[in-house]
Amino acid sequence: MPLIDMPEFAGELLEEFAARRTSRVNTPVIQPAEPFLDMAGEDLRRRIFMTESETGESLCLRPEFTIPVCLRHIETATGTPKRYSYLGEVFRQRREGASEFYQAGIEDLGDTDIAAADARVVIDATAILQRLLPGRSLAVTLGDQQVFEAVVAALGLPLGWQKRLVQAFGDMAQLDALLESLVHPKPMTGLDARVAGLLATGDEAVLVDYLDTVMQETGYSTNASRSPLEIARRLREKLALAATRLPDESFELLKQFLALQAPLPQASQVLGDFAARAKLKLDGALSAFDKRVAALANAGVDLETVTYGAAFGRPLDYYTGLVFEVVEAGSDSVLAGGGRYDRLLTLLGAQEKIPAVGFSLWLDRIKAVRGSDKP
């Protein structure tokens, strides 16, 4: 299949990136697979094109740019703050559309003014789209994983359940299934008798050895799946979580929170009212939320065009705070999306914590909207 043609508006994109004082970065198409498998989430994991080197190293075709850009930043020991831009192909298995397509975007690393940096990426994404799609009305949906994490923590759930719920944030079907299993827990079934016995003993090392042996005997490749250690730990976690029940009151509060939605000018009041009714201490998360709203307003953003959704997230595990998407008003086709990922660079090997936020533009979708203007 031929590669997708470079979009005709690529020059305008590069002009926008230069005007925003970004450094354009190129990253290899072939990437080490492990960072994506570990940190990008199940949704992207299923879409990755996998391969391996002659030495057996797991590799993949570049499925997105954020992780490669961060890895390059770490490898080159570049100081911060630093703003990177990119324009290139990504490769994902998709039900609709080509599996190879262009993305462009900006990654903003190291700015310690979190609210200002968050506001800037939303403004940059919408401003670039307004140039590429003149006369089109845009709508922004904004969520906040930090607020969701604060609600889950304030409810006093075990850390294992907090982690699972946070990982499912943004996927309502998965969240609903998890909440149902919390309210009506079911014992683990269908386990190999030997695995069940080893789980009962709590001997992780022996369980890992057994799983490794079984995987080798059956030819089950760890290049396309989890390692024996990962599987063992997930099984142990599932066993512990299966014994946990969420009180009805906490379940109702979570459902109420996830149903919250409001135009951004009213969102702070809506969240504050919820916290007061639920008697949950969310001060830190709500303060950060309020600062971001103020930064957007101070930058001249029409807050009425932005909708806050408490359940809104994006299907990538590395987000930690702001998440957002931009669509043409009246459409559900995402033209730009991004968010904050403050833990990612440390997980990838950075020696110090580097706050980070960014966004990607879906160029094939932008091209389709531009094409719809033509007679």
From Swiss-Prot:
Compartment(s) where it occurs, according to its Swiss-Prot or TrEMBL record: Cytoplasm
Pathway assigned to this chain's UniProt record: Amino-acid biosynthesis; L-histidine biosynthesis; L-histidine from 5-phospho-alpha-D-ribose 1-diphosphate: step 1/9
Disulphide bridges, residue numbers: none
Major location (coarse): cytoplasm
A single Gene Ontology CC term: cytoplasm
InterPro entries the record matches: aa-tRNA-synth_II/BPL/LPL, HisRS-like_core, HisRS/HisZ, HisZ
Function: Required for the first step of histidine biosynthesis. May allow the feedback regulation of ATP phosphoribosyltransferase activity by histidine.
Record protein name field: ATP phosphoribosyltransferase regulatory subunit
